[in-house]
Amino acid sequence: MSRTPTEVADAVSEVFRGVFDQLAAWRTPIEQLLAASAGGVGAAAGGTGAGASSGEVRPVTLDTTVADLVLPRLEEDDPMLVGAGFIADGEVVRGKGVHFAWWLGPLDDNPVLGSTDGPTRLDLSTRGYTEYLRDFRALEWYRIPATTRHAHVTGPYVDHLCTCDYILTLTMPVHDADGERMVGVVGADVAVRTLERALLAAFLDVEEPLALVNEHGRVVLSTEPALQVGQLAGPGSETVPCTGTPFAVRVRPAASGS
């Protein structure tokens, strides 16, 4: 029995709901750690919490907390996520204006990092990404949550920093103890090819060709041969929103040529 486009849109929503729920689950202990640090309370196991005088969390404490949260998801047999972590802005990490507590999942013949058989820490300090560090607040994955105070999906785009592949970046704002100031984002990267493995069977179960597009009409995945990832799709005979996401399923989408 074939599916309807609405059922396919529901399947898309379910996948992204799972990632957003995971981000929310990670955000809570990170905010608790930062709040405890601001209050001068050592929040991490082993007495490695922040000092009362600074109100800042120690980098090692933050890194340990974030690693304990994200590594289990990156170590799954068939992980949905290819990267995850927390990016701190401002003066919440001792001795740092910005701090990337970010890990990459196992990589296969990556042109930048080679192949890895387990998660690795993203170390921007050794890779010459000074411009990236200087300008990251202007990037969509950070700028939109900072402006709206809501979770956001960026992409699809080619991640030249880490995976060198089409990805979607999901980010959620992390706030200070008062909940008034955003102090960073918790986030996760999903490779488009991983998303395709999770959803393609559902898309193929509809007789008409379909395309999953973002709010700008850019293709994430498609069963229309004329449409490739990243291409702009033209209007379709029907558009079905994917609830809780910026995506929609277009039925019989036209190729725009760009």
PLM regions: where:
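Extracellular/periplasmic juxtamembrane segments that couple receptor/chemosensory ectodomains to their
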Residues: P225-S258
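Short, hydrophobic-rich beta-strand element in sensory/regulatory alpha-beta domains
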Residues: P72-R73, M80-E91, E208-L212
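Solvent-exposed, extracytoplasmic
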Residues: V190-V219
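Conserved beta-strands of PAS-like sensory domains
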Residues: T163-L199
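Extracellular/periplasmic ligand-sensing ectodomains of membrane signal-transduction proteins
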Residues: L81-T147, S222
